[in-house]
């Protein structure tokens, strides 16, 4: 009996491009006389914009292990993120306690894999956590996973992470295979969060529309994008609003991606 195991893999793994990987899988499938599901090709060919559109916050997860190739892709990008962003992000797997406490009761279930978003204390740490954390979230989406940012709905489990004396944890990000792909929540309009108009470039409006799809704390969307123009490179300014909930600096970093 021939078993042909296929798991979705991300873009750019080991220097391969999607258009190079896809024919290899197609040829292997033909030799094995199997038909790859449409969902496989959808994940394999997912672009950054596809990931932005399909990403929704998911809080309930299946009891399903992350494949080795998915873990390797995540760990590789975490290493890049830590180096570029001067962070100390850590991946924790097969650990069910962090999201099982009273803070997560009724909100999360089945979470066994998550990112500990940490770094050296500084004025811009939250913003960097947001920017690079969302980069990991979109990679997870392209790998066929789901995710959810968590500001307080978790507990720190001793022995699952390490911190230097001058570092702190800003938040966690749950990742895994969701029970559902999630749903799009109510959003503000382009005019609510920007100065987009018929006079501003189309790329700016599209950028604002993408920003409105980004996760923010309790969907508060307390940011404003302003097209300033300028040559040779046009400038865009982002400002954060006032929030009793907080996390606006982290939200701003997420939106910047």
Give the ranges of each region predicted by the language model.
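Acidic, surface-exposed loops and disordered segments
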Residues: 46-257
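Macrodomain-like recognition of ADP-ribose-binding/processing modules
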Residues: 1-45
């Amino acid at each position: 009996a021939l078993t042909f195991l296929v798991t979705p893999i991300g873009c750019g793994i080991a220097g391969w491009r999607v258009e190079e990987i896809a024919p290899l899988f197609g040829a292997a499938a033909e030799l094995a006389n199997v038909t790859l599901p449409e969902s496989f090709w959808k994940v394999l060919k997912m672009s950054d914009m596809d990931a932005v559109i399909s990403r929704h916050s998911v809080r309930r997860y299946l009891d399903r292990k992350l494949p080795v190739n998915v873990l390797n892709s995540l760990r590789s990008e975490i290493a890049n993120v830590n180096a570029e962003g001067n962070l100390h992000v850590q991946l924790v797997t097969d650990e069910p306690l962090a999201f099982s406490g009273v803070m997560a009761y009724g909100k999360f279930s089945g979470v066994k894999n998550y990112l500990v978003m940490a770094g050296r204390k500084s004025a811009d740490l939250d913003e960097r956590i947001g920017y690079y954390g969302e980069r990991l979230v979109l990679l997870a989406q392209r790998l066929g996973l789901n995710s959810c940012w968590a500001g307080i709905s978790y507990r720190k489990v001793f022995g699952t992470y390490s911190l230097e004396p001058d570092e702190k944890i800003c938040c966690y990000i749950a990742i895994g295979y969701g029970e559902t792909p999630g749903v799009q929540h109510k959003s503000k309009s382009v005019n609510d969060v920007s100065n987009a108009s018929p006079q501003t470039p189309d790329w700016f409006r599209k950028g604002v529309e993408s920003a409105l799809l980004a996760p923010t704390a309790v969907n508060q969307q307390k940011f404003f994008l302003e097209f300033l123009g300028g040559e040779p490179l046009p400038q865009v300014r982002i400002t954060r609003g006032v929030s009793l909930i907080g996390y606006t600096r982290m939200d701003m970093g997420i939106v910047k991606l």
